[in-house]
């Protein structure tokens, strides 16, 4: 895709793109399992280099090797039958942010090749197939208004997702929005708080983007209602290549290998990190 806000958009020729092999992906899962993690997120672009069946095979392998673990996918927009194939292979969850619930705003953030209606169709297809569904939006994205944010809350109230991912918009120098203002910590924390009140049981991450624009952003996210942290299991050699926005943090503490660092930071704010499947409790 070629979303105008994304640092790894199709038109950015400066990106050092990569694919992980099946063996590399399974090695990451092996390492995560030893570290105590019981849920894995597989994320990538809408990449023709991976067939639908190839992704299904990866899901099957992880579920066969670690049947006590959850597998979450985030591979963008696909037909119903593709989502069904991956669900039958064992995928438990799917992350697909709606980004904005206002059609005109959506069209200002995306090229003509992308459709608001198709994005919404995907989310409802995923729900109908029994996935635990994650959606969400950027806070402070270009051209966003307070009315847009209210529409986002209304959209989520109708969708009733199990996971909600929001974070401040942070510009990337190789996008059409390079000179746009970034979102604010305060506005993001207000939206997290409102979502927690609306969705008492939802899985709401305190995102990397919050930690990027404020040193204590992630901790403040937890204080305002977030309850999920997502350590990075990607091979160290490729982590910096996944730069959705400028100055994305890629520190030791963001790494899955620094479990102790994460535990200590959480405990300092009165929290305890639980490493289980993290299923939504209905």
Task: Give the positions of each predicted feature.
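Local cysteine-cluster metal-coordination motifs and their immediate loop/turn environment
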Residues: 1-10
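Core AdoMet radical
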Residues: 10-25, 32-53, 58-59, 63-123, ...
């Amino acid at each position: 895709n070629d979303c105008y806000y994304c640092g790894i958009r199709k038109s950015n020729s400066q990106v050092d793109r990569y694919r992980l092999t099946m063996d590399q992906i399974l090695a990451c899962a092996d390492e995560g399992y030893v570290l105590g993690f019981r849920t894995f997120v597989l994320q990538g672009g809408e990449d023709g280099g991976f067939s639908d069946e190839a992704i299904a095979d990866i899901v099957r392998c992880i579920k066969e090797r670690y049947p006590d673990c959850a597998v979450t996918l985030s591979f963008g927009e696909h037909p119903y039958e593709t989502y069904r194939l991956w669900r039958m292979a064992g995928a438990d969850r799917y992350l697909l942010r709606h980004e904005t619930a206002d059609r005109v705003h959506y069209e200002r953030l995306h090229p003509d090749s992308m459709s608001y209606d198709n994005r919404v169709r995907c989310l409802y297809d995923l729900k109908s197939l029994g996935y635990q569904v994650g959606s969400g939006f950027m806070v402070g994205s270009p051209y966003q208004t307070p009315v847009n944010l209210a529409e986002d809350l209304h959209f989520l109230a109708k969708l009733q997702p199990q996971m909600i991912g929001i974070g401040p918009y942070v510009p990337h120098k190789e996008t059409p929005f390079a000179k746009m203002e970034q979102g604010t910590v305060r506005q993001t924390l207000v939206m997290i708080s409102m979502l927690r009140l609306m969705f008492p049981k939802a899985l709401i991450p305190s995102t990397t983007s919050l930690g990027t624009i404020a040193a204590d952003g992630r901790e403040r996210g937890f204080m305002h209602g977030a309850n999920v942290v997502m350590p990075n299991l990607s091979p160290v050699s490729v982590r910096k290549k996944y730069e959705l926005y400028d100055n994305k943090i890629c520190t030791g503490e963001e790494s899955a290998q620094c479990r102790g660092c994460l535990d200590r930071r959480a405990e300092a704010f009165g929290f305890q990190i639980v490493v289980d499947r993290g299923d939504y409790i209905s």
